[in-house]
Amino acid sequence: MKLSILDQSPIRVGATAADALRESVALAVAADGLGYHRYWVAEHHGSGGLAGSAPEILIGQIASATKRLRVGSGGVMMNHYSALKVAETFRVLDAFHPGRIDLGLGRAPGSDQITAVALSPAYQPISIEHYPRQIRDLLDFLNATVPGDHPFARIKVIPDGATVPEVWLLGSSDQSGILAGFMGQPFSFAHFINGEGGADVMEAYRRNFRPSAQLDAPKGNIGVHVVCAETMAEADRQAKPRDLWRDAGGGARP
């Protein structure tokens, strides 16, 4: 089993958001030395407790500070961006760190509704087809497979290179797993969001998987919230503030 880290860049009491970002880089360096496989950073906006608002920038910092880790987003919230812009951004990251960049994608806003509107000034209600269409466009842009009759067929994503970021679809529901399977992409189940039904979601992913140019068999991982300590009592003590912060809605600093 390969162990990886999903870092939400929590802000400690008495520390600043800038401190939290620097601590994320330091933690990634330690994880690199300990043999962890992947290091993903999250996207949240307007949060009083989480500092990671620009994962694409933090990924570059972490990849530059480490030697072996695969580094990526867990994830980029696609509702805020165009597929082309995300493809270009992660192609740039891959140009500097070929074969080490992961692109995890999600559909949640990572914010409250007002902040989501501020992120997208031309905000309009998003149809159910919007996210799957973005994923298809993004995969085509990344892999230079835009169909010849598509309005975007003449667009070339720069830079291009010998490697491509590894795309992962993130989710906590069977619909997310089914979409990842239908698209033929790796799937990451967010157990830390939905602690129930993970086995059923992964089975739905495997059952609906269709081989793609990027992946010929299902590939998945699971994100869990973990507290490590010398004793169970100490682990419970460390976990309690996080539980209270989560139950309060995440606004207060952990």
Residue ranges and their predicted role:
Residues 124-157, 196-254:
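An alpha-helical appendage that flanks or caps ligand/catalytic pockets
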Residues 7-22, 74-84, 161-171, 226-229:
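Active-site mouth loops of central-metabolism enzymes
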Residues 177-196, 202:
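A conserved active-site cap/scaffold subdomain adjacent to cofactor or substrate pockets
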Residues 32-33, 59-68, 90, 94-101, ...:
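Acidic (Asp/Glu)-rich catalytic clusters
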Residues 2-17, 79-146, 187, 195:
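Flexible, glycine-rich active-site loops centered on histidine and acidic residues
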Residues 1-69:
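N-terminal beta1-alpha1-beta2 module of alpha/beta enzyme domains
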Residues 24-29, 56-60, 87-91, 132-139, ...:
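Generic structural signal for well-ordered alpha-helices
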Residues 3-7, 39-41, 71-74, 101-105, ...:
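Hydrophobic faces of well-ordered beta-strands that scaffold small-molecule active sites
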